[in-house]
Amino acid sequence: MCSPDPEDMHILTNDIPSFDKSLDPYGPEGHLALDIERFSSFMNKPDSRIMSKPVIVRGIPWRILAICRHQQNNRQVATSRSRNNYNFGFFLQCNNDDLLQKRGMWRCYGQATLEVLNANGPPIQKKIHHSFHNTEVDWGFSNYDQYDTLTSPKDGYVIDDVIRLRCRFTADVPTGANYMWDSKKHTGCIGLRNQGATCYMNSILQSFYFTTGFRRAVYNMEVGTEPNESNIVLAMQRVFYELQMSSEAVETNSLTRAFGWDKLDAFNQHDVQEFCRVLLDNLETKMKGTSEEKSIPNLFRGNMKSYIKCLDVDYESSRTESFYDVQLNVLGMDSLERAFDAYTTPETLDDDNKYDAGDHGLQRAEKGVKFVELPPVLHVQLMRFQYCGVEQKINERFSFPEKMNLSNCCELGPMLNEEDCVYSLHAVLVHSGEFHGGHYVTYINVNLHESAVDPTATAKWCKFDDDVVSRTTTDDAIVSNFGGEKAMNSSAYMLVYVRDNAIDQVLAPIPDTQIPQSVSRTFEMERMHRNREKKKQEEEQMCMSITLVTPDILATNHSFDLIEPVTITDVLPHETVYKHMVTAELYQFVQEKLFEKSTLPKVDMFDSDDETRMKRKEILRRLKTKKFGFRLWRMTDSYTVDKPQKMASRLRPSDFIEYSIDTRLDHTLSHDTETIYVEHSQFLQPLNEYLPTRDILFFLKYYDAITDKFTIIGHVTLDSHKRLNLYRMTFCDLLGLPKDTELKYYIEHAPNHVEQIDDPNRSTISRLVDDQDGAIVIVEKADPTAKKDAKTKMIELYNDVEFEFSQQFYSKMPNEEPFELFTKRFCLEQKLTDVTEFIGSELNVDPRNVMLWTRVSGSRFEPNFDDYAVTGIQCKYLTLRTLHDPRQHKKYSVSYAIFPFPVNEVHTTRMFVRLYRQMPNGNVEELNLFPPKDGTVTDLIAEAKRYYPSVEGGSGKFRLLQIGTSPLNNQRVFQIYNENTAIVDLDQRPVYKQQAQHTLNCRIEEIPHDELDVAQGEFFCPVVHYDREPTKLFGVSFVIKIRNGELMTDVRDRLRRKLPDVSDAEFAKYKFALLSRDKLCRNIEFNAGEKVNLMDMANQTTGVPQVYIGLDHKSPSQHSNEAAIRILN
């Protein structure tokens, strides 16, 4: 099988007829026919092609493509059997129209049978399946069959030089970026959106929705007084109402929120059968005491009788119990009928298993079940998931009929007659995948009610695959889901049958007019609210927010730059403007906001009618010649370039917004939030002319040495080609100083870089500020007696930083509480020793014992001792090693710890290690210690006791255990370390490159009284928890003392005492085993009289036990796919 070569372009065909409109163009299947006349002539013309009439399936044209191709590479030589040197190619072609080719990337999976009809017998049939896409639109056979075979008169394939080709095919819904499948239009139904892994829920909800008796009951339920967010009834009504009234796929977020699920729950796939039971039970509980109390039982509940009937005497014992679904075995069964027969076939009680019939004594009897009442809607759960040592899915072939009679499985009588046993298949819920994951879809016969009422109506099966709904064939819905194909691993998992005599009641359509008014009113109001919100969001996307900054606002700033960022974000008002307005309209908008109202008419920018367009056109005509007494500038947060030192950013007016009736605002302002500086006239003088090629916008900032304060005087336009000193008299005039006052000049490039202009006559203004608008020139009187100048003051402001100090603990003493937070301002150039001395004086501790750090890794503070040695280090080290920006960083958080010894000992005589400690409640927590570098386990334990003393009634003795840290040995205990073992010889791994810091694979715990002494013949055996497989460890491992020759039942009792938080009922479910190296050695049965054999648990020469005891029970934090479904509201 292959696709034809693209160079085969010669086509032998007449005009292709138009599409056959009598067929459903969006249906799942099609039939193609092509009769090739003068076939011998066709096969003697190389590279000729002919195509059939197209048939539209899934909205795509399909054709038969026949090709005569020359045999390539002489692989086939003409012989007496093959008198023709050309191959006959037979292909199915998908979507090869030029118009459809322009759709871009697309993909469509199809299956087909390619046939050559035979006048004398069966046709030649060859099957294909292929995923067609935009670069591979043909699939089939380059050499369908031998030319001699096709043309042989006795074979009957070519009659009168005519060959007849046929193709039967089915296709899935096409996918692709430009294929928008309209489920409502093509099927009359809509789907449900998948939140992540909620396909199981979507499948059963669709089945419930088309069970209109259930939908009607949900509509009629009382909503109650629960909050909307947790109201399951309201959420179910919303889903059903949207499925009935909407034209787009429905969201289920409100339903899962009402269940009490979070976003993560939506990514946990569950069992559809379990979800069905839990949801029905929840809704039935909510219906109690209301008019709908019996709705669910009347739809889904049946009764079965369990009986034991004696064969030789007249005696029978029976009881009747209700059911909401029937669970049938799949393993070993090949059909639904056989599974029902096996379910109700009685078991004979004979020989040693006779039934005790009371006064009749032991009797031969039959034990079985019979259905005594069948529900209108029968849910059949197929048990395809089983645990047989391992978790597995049973994908064996299991057929089920479209029509079913259960009379052989029933006890007919007044409550159940023959007609009550006849069912029609309504829905098939299908699972594809394996045990722990996969995908659910459902097939529903949406025409079952109509076909039951009208004998001429046919089944209309639809496939519901989350948000995509498509028509499908009956075979695809039923036969294709019998299972048995390993490659597909897709099979029916749940069947929904409806009793024939109840179809009119259970599946009766619900016209829109029959939906309760309270339901319609509620959700129509929600729909209107959503539409308003949607319109609001669309309008917001067409708008931007601007903040207007004026010279009087700048005058309030006495610090860095022109304005504090917080003033823009939190203080000044934010105005909304239309992105598509032109800059002239922005000028008009600012004029009305800040200066004076306009006589121009108002228009709504969101209206697009003719009247609005005409009004706007008139406004633009009048604005074309209008003059404004201000200029607008875009303020940007940018960095200076080509400067020798790294500098903070600066917020300056940098881009002039030119007045125009042609330039749109979104072509000038690119962000959704922008800051605009309004440059208007000051000092009772008209606004100077601005030429972008000549002038630079400057801001004048004055430093008064007497008041020690900066003041922004205003803006001024300077000629970039002139020297700065030429404007001295202008500056004096603006500052109100005598015109002969000598001035000193500085350029404020950034908060951390102020440059003094030593010779204002040497360089042009453009060179001083890199030809950038928005530059700040600081001026001050040239007073040699002043104590400080503007640059010194700016450095002083920059280095003055507030720090907030909070205490952290490495090894927290019991009941020890941290000191309260406190703040202090420091100069960034001060030494860290000043900080530690301040903390020491505040807390009355030795400053040498104070450890500082700011680095945070996740939720854990990670100090680096080499970097944070305080001697000779400045406070700027506490700014997280980033460039300090005083406009953004108003306060830095610094953590400190108080050690019981000088910090510098960590580098000299001590080492930092992290290990684990077993708490009295059984939990494990991290422990940080500073033992001597040349110490032993005894020193390590002594250091631990400083922070964690013995519990009341404890032995006061501690031990150190080697544990595992990888996922495979999760905290598993390997051995108990000897107290004389050197710390450097312990199992450890570096945390950082610095050798002073390590994590030990160890755990410290207090020794129980009964394990203090170890006699001859006694030893400690590790114990682990695992879930079915020895590699799936969980929980906290521990050790237990075992004596050679003692009863195994005593060991079990000692294990029981080690687990005080486990109930007796739960402990009874535990299984026990001997494990070695993550593998099972043997199970432990604890038989009466069985004793411990030391040889079974021999130690290796290393002292590490070869085997350990495993407790097999379910993990509390089981796999998400195995977690039980919970509906919390």
Curated annotation (Swiss-Prot):
GO terms for cellular component: cytosol; nucleus. Its main location: nucleus. The active site is at 199 (nucleophile), 439 (proton acceptor). It comes from the Eukaryota. One of its GO terms (biological process) is regulation of protein stability. Residues 29-169 form the MATH domain. InterPro entries: MATH/TRAF_dom (IPR002083), Papain-like_cys_pep_sf (IPR038765), Peptidase_C19 (IPR050164), Peptidase_C19_UCH (IPR001394), TRAF-like (IPR008974), USP7_ICP0-binding_dom (IPR024729), USP_C (IPR029346), USP_CS (IPR018200). PROSITE patterns: MATH (PS50144), USP_1 (PS00972), USP_2 (PS00973), USP_3 (PS50235). GO terms for molecular function: cysteine-type deubiquitinase activity. Its EC number is 3.4.19.12. Keywords: Hydrolase, Nucleus, Protease, Thiol protease, Ubl conjugation pathway. Residues 190-500 form the USP domain. It is found in: Nucleus. Pfam families: MATH, UCH, USP7_C2, USP7_ICP0_bdg. Gene3D superfamilies: Apoptosis, Tumor Necrosis Factor Receptor Associated Protein 2, Chain A (2.60.210.10), Cysteine proteinases (3.90.70.10), Phosphatidylinositol 3-kinase Catalytic Subunit, Chain A, domain 1 (3.10.20.90). Hydrolase that deubiquitinates target proteins. PANTHER family: UBIQUITIN CARBOXYL-TERMINAL HYDROLASE (PTHR24006), UBIQUITIN CARBOXYL-TERMINAL HYDROLASE 7 (PTHR24006:SF644). This is Ubiquitin carboxyl-terminal hydrolase 7. It comes from Caenorhabditis briggsae. The gene is math-33.
